[in-house]
Regions:
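Beta-propeller folds
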Residues: 2-209
């Protein structure tokens, strides 16, 4: 029998790549889940909604083809508690094993509007009522109000290699695999956070080969 020829284009399009699934996020209705898919042909990504029972796609919640601000792609995404808003990370820059900074966009599933809200920040977290986003930047904590678009600084004493507010130090991240050291109260009115004081820890240089 004649052998089918394989083209370079087919290889780079991923025609022969094994099929798989990235991490899924279950929706609160327990009947559906979302997956971040990629389309190599159009160089775009989609947040798609699927049905657990049939495993078939129900709809596309967001397609980067429709949003030039996301041309660099989606690194991760998080839903608000009511699942009416999505916080999207892109242009992530690693710090240590788990920690990173990224730019964040807020997408409204009702209005279909995409807005850049945060730049070079860590661990943005929706308040339970979905009206605010707490985040860390340069060792300090902040709260962004979605309606007013105003940002309030919560701590001011953050300093590299000295004071860390709301983010774990390297040891906690490496040994316990968690980065965010703050959380909202149930009524969305308060933040609890850990403050690390490393000001007495001596510094030294080490060559890496």
């Amino acid at each position: 029998t004649a052998q089918q020829k394989i083209t370079v284009e087919e290889i780079y399009r991923g025609e022969f790549r094994t099929k798989g699934m990235d991490a899924l996020q279950s929706m609160k209705n327990t009947n559906q889940y979302t997956v971040l898919n990629s389309d190599r042909t159009t160089r775009s990504q989609q947040i798609d909604l699927y049905d657990f029972a049939t495993l078939k796609k129900v709809s596309t919640l967001l397609d980067t083809k429709s949003h030039t601000d996301l041309a660099d792609g989606i690194d991760s995404y998080t839903f608000s508690n009511d699942e009416k808003q999505i916080l999207i990370a892109n242009n992530s820059n690693p710090i240590f094993r788990h920690s990173f900074t990224a730019n964040y966009y807020l997408y409204s599933l009702n209005s279909k509007n995409l807005t850049k809200v945060l730049e070079n920040v860590q661990e943005p977290t929706f308040s339970p009522d979905g009206t605010k986003i707490a985040f860390a930047k340069e060792n300090n904590l902040f709260v962004y109000d979605i309606a007013s678009k105003n940002t309030a600084q919560i701590t001011t004493d953050g300093k590299k290699n000295a004071i860390i507010n709301g983010i774990t130090d390297w040891v906690y991240e490496e040994e316990f695999a968690f980065v965010r050291a703050f959380d909202w109260s149930a009524d969305s009115k308060k933040l609890a956070f850990i403050r690390f004081d490393e000001s007495e820890v001596p510094e030294f240089s080490m060559s890496i080969f």
